[in-house]
Regions:
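Multi-pass membrane proteins that catalyze or facilitate reactions on polyprenyl-/lipid-phosphate substrates
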Residues: 1-276
Length: 276
């Protein structure tokens, strides 16, 4: 039992770090599952459920950190500020629609055909190269949108279209949306912030559907509940730290370091499994 709890701590740690950095949480979790297995009843169904729960822990961190900014009912806000918050939420919903529609239509097909190490490794490398290219291009371009409140509905839906690419494991939801935002002239910090906000309905919706599927097909024992709670808590706490750190980092640095990391990791993964 203790060993299984330690494994869930590791899973929560990986989720909390990789969900918000543009390096693909799904890709890292798929790789982790190849090396570390949880000893539970019906492991396949449980791992799907477990991944959902640790994602919800990560999402809760965004809600806590940005609660005032996201809360249109905050009594300390003026009428204009409340209107701005509602406007932000409408833009988030517009941005979520493309991936929600495509994800709903293709989710089962992608689970069956794309969730493997080859796809993960290739997408890690391709998006690593894309980040280096975009950051190089960005040096010669002026930032048009410096704050998340300046993002228009048109820009929101284009960022949402980029989020559709993240349906391929190894791409990174935050990586796809941040990359799209930068290409559209959004500052790194505003792009990262809007990416965090897009994650709330995107991940809650996807996680909610998988949660219901699991409950209709399986039951949870005491051990499973402890493992789920541990993973969720660790993911939440680590996400708090990572989100704060990333927002500080992007104000002074580019995403090039993440591009190099993706290329190196993707290459190592591809070589490892090809030589296995």
């Amino acid at each position: 039992m203790i060993l299984e709890i330690l494994k869930t701590v590791l899973y929560g740690l990986v989720e909390g770090i990789t969900e918000w950095l543009p390096i693909s949480s799904t890709g890292h979790l798929i790789l982790l599952e190849n090396f570390i297995h949880l000893k539970v009843d019906n492991p396949g169904a449980f791992m799907e459920m477990f991944n959902v729960v640790i994602q919800l822990g990560a999402i809760l961190a965004v809600i806590v950190l940005f609660f005032r900014k996201l809360n249109p009912f905050a009594p300390s806000k003026s009428v204009a500020e409340k209107k701005g918050t509602w406007d932000l939420w409408f833009k988030v919903i517009v941005g979520v629609l493309p991936s929600a529609i495509i994800g709903f239509l293709l989710d089962d097909w992608m689970d069956a055909h794309l969730y493997n190490y080859v796809v993960v490794a290739i997408m890690l490398i391709l998006y690593g190269i894309a980040f280096l290219f975009v950051e190089q291009l960005n040096k010669r371009r002026a930032v048009k949108i410096k704050d998340v409140s300046e993002i228009s509905y048109r820009t929101a839906i284009f960022i949402g279209l980029f989020q559709c690419l993240a349906l391929i494991p190894g791409t990174s939801r935050s990586g796809a949306t941040i990359l799209g935002a930068i290409l559209l002239g959004v500052s790194r910090s505003a792009g990262a912030e809007f990416s965090f906000f897009l994650a709330i309905p995107t991940m809650v919706g996807a996680s909610g559907l998988k949660f219901l599927d699991f409950l209709t097909e399986s039951t949870l024992g005491g051990t499973e509940i402890v493992l789920l709670a541990t993973g969720c808590l660790v993911s939440f706490l680590v996400s708090l730290l990572v989100i704060k750190s990333l927002m500080e980092y992007v104000r002074k640095h580019s995403f090039a370091a993440f591009g190099y990391y993706r290329i190196i990791l993707g290459s190592v993964v591809l070589l490892y499994f090809l030589m296995k």
